[in-house]
Amino acid sequence: MQFDVTIEIPKGQRNKYEVDHKTGRVRLDRYLYTPMAYPTDYGFIEDTLGEDGDPLDALVLLPEPLFPGVLVEARPVGMFRMVDEHGGDDKVLCVPVNDHRWDHIHGIIDVPTFELDAIKHFFVHYKDLEPGKFVKAADWVGRDEAEAEVQRSVERFKAGGH
């Protein structure tokens, strides 16, 4: 399975950008309240609709941060299942397709534990200081579950659009 991911937030940022799906422009949503930065490039999978009503979120492992709006052809290796104040907010963990440095990463088991722990720590705590926001459940699942969620999100998009 391969798909395009639109990067919204580069690794290392505290600015939370979002693509305005009506205009196609990148908008500053907020500056994170917690003194933490995004641990990977963050964006969404094109032509999907997640459980939260937004395109399905994606995390892309890259050696250098990209710019908001850049498309990356990616493949899933796992997924971070997360529930926040709006409900399900899963994030598909991906690697770029056309970069042989990632050929050895086939599933979540191949991603270094420290990397997974750092990503989990960020998403469990990044809303801690924001009034009315929270994360109440979060854990990693494998590639098969990630691919199934991508497929469900594609079907939701086709049924309802965005």
Swiss-Prot record:
Sequence positions that bind Mg(2+) 3: 84, 89
Catalytic activity as recorded in UniProt: diphosphate + H2O = 2 phosphate + H(+)
| Name of the molecule in the record | Inorganic pyrophosphatase
Q: Its function?
A: Catalyzes the hydrolysis of inorganic pyrophosphate (PPi) forming two phosphate ions.
| Organism encoding this protein | Mycobacterium leprae (strain TN)
Binding of Mg(2+) 1 occurs at 52, 57, 89
Subunit description: Homohexamer.
Which GO terms label this protein's molecular function in UniProt? inorganic diphosphate phosphatase activity; magnesium ion binding
Q: Where is the active site?
A: 89 (proton acceptor)
Name the SUPFAM superfamilies on file.
Inorganic pyrophosphatase (SSF50324)
